[in-house]
Amino acid sequence: MARKKIALIGSGMIGGTLAHIIGLKELGDVVLFDIAEGIPQGKALDIAESSPVDGFDVSLTGANSYDVIEGADVVIVTAGVARKPGMSRDDLLGINLKVMEQVGAGIKKYASSAFVICITNPLDAMVWALQKFSGLPTQKVVGMAGILDSARFRHFLSEEFKISVKDVTAFVLGGHGDSMVPLVRYSTVGGISLPDLVKMGWTTQEKIDQIIQRTRDGGAEIVSLLKTGSAFYAPAASAVSMAEAYLKDTKRVVPVAAYLSGQYGVKDTYVGVPVVIGAGGVERVIEIDLDKEEKAAFEKSVSAVQKLCEACIAVAPGLK
């Protein structure tokens, strides 16, 4: 059986890390695309030269033309400008929207059957625009955000409780930005909910609130520390887990930026919700029961995303 083909559009820090993780997992052959000559070729060669040491067999290729992605099973999009200190994800909209238009055209021409994962910020608006530009079915185009935000939430909780991160479950709803909604009620440690752990004296509500805020600021914290770039290890790991669920048809339940067509009372919008990912792409959107406070926070987040989509339409009226 022929190996799967995974195309990476954008060969920066996330793109290179994606290629390395995919190689280590032997998920499929990798093609790296970038408009900068030499960068995708150099990274592909460097990672390929690590394969005898790490013992993996995949083909890695770098190129500067879109035809290299032809027939890809999965396309992961990281192309665009990354945040710098003092910038919000939303500040990138104008520049990265133009990039999504070019990427969408390339995917439409060469990889129209692929499962597409978008990482470019501002995430929810960019994946919405990318789906429109590419014309691919909505269930085959998703955004990577919820897994990353949930991973940050889980990591901070594991540090607070001094326990294995494997025993922490948590997920974050809403847009990938300041209005994201970490759901305390649905987050557990060893199956025990966070509100119950507060009652048991394991932590305080004040500390949980601090962790929620740190989760919201997770990306900005890394940007301020790095000074010349943004997070790439955790975003890459998150996207690979989504690609793996699709390629192996594992039916993973994960939070992603998915297209809503009435679920949660939202239409024609990409926003973070729990879904089932399998060979059909997004096979099911899971509608969880939200209390009044959670619903209000989610609606605020959706509104912020929709305003960004309106800003996209102002720049590219064809998206309407």
Swiss-Prot record:
This protein's record includes keyword Acyltransferase: no
Enzyme class: oxidoreductase
Residues noted as binding substrate in the record, renumbered to the chain: R83, R89, N121, R152
Binding residue positions for NAD(+): G10, S11, G12, M13, I14, G15, D34, N96, I119, T120, N121
Catalytic activity as recorded in UniProt: (S)-malate + NAD(+) = oxaloacetate + NADH + H(+)
EC number: 1.1.1.37
CDD domains membership: LDH-like_MDH
GO term, biological process aspect, one: tricarboxylic acid cycle
Domain of life: Bacteria
Active site location: H176
Pfam families reported for this sequence: Ldh_1_C (PF02866), Ldh_1_N (PF00056)
Keyword terms of this UniProt record: NAD, Oxidoreductase, Tricarboxylic acid cycle
Alphabetized GO MF terms: L-lactate dehydrogenase activity; L-malate dehydrogenase (NAD+) activity
Gene3D superfamilies in UniProt: Lactate dehydrogenase/glycoside hydrolase, family 4, C-terminal (3.90.110.10), NAD(P)-binding Rossmann-like Domain (3.40.50.720)
InterPro entries: L-lactate/malate_DH (IPR001557), Lactate/malate_DH_C (IPR022383), Lactate/malate_DH_N (IPR001236), Lactate_DH/Glyco_Ohase_4_C (IPR015955), Malate_DH_type3 (IPR011275), NAD(P)-bd_dom_sf (IPR036291)
Function: Catalyzes the reversible oxidation of malate to oxaloacetate.
Entry-linked PANTHER family: L-2-HYDROXYCARBOXYLATE DEHYDROGENASE (NAD(P)(+)) (PTHR43128), L-LACTATE DEHYDROGENASE (PTHR43128:SF16)
Family: Belongs to the LDH/MDH superfamily. MDH type 3 family.
Protein name per the record: Malate dehydrogenase
Record organism: Bartonella henselae (strain ATCC 49882 / DSM 28221 / CCUG 30454 / Houston 1)
Gene name as annotated: mdh
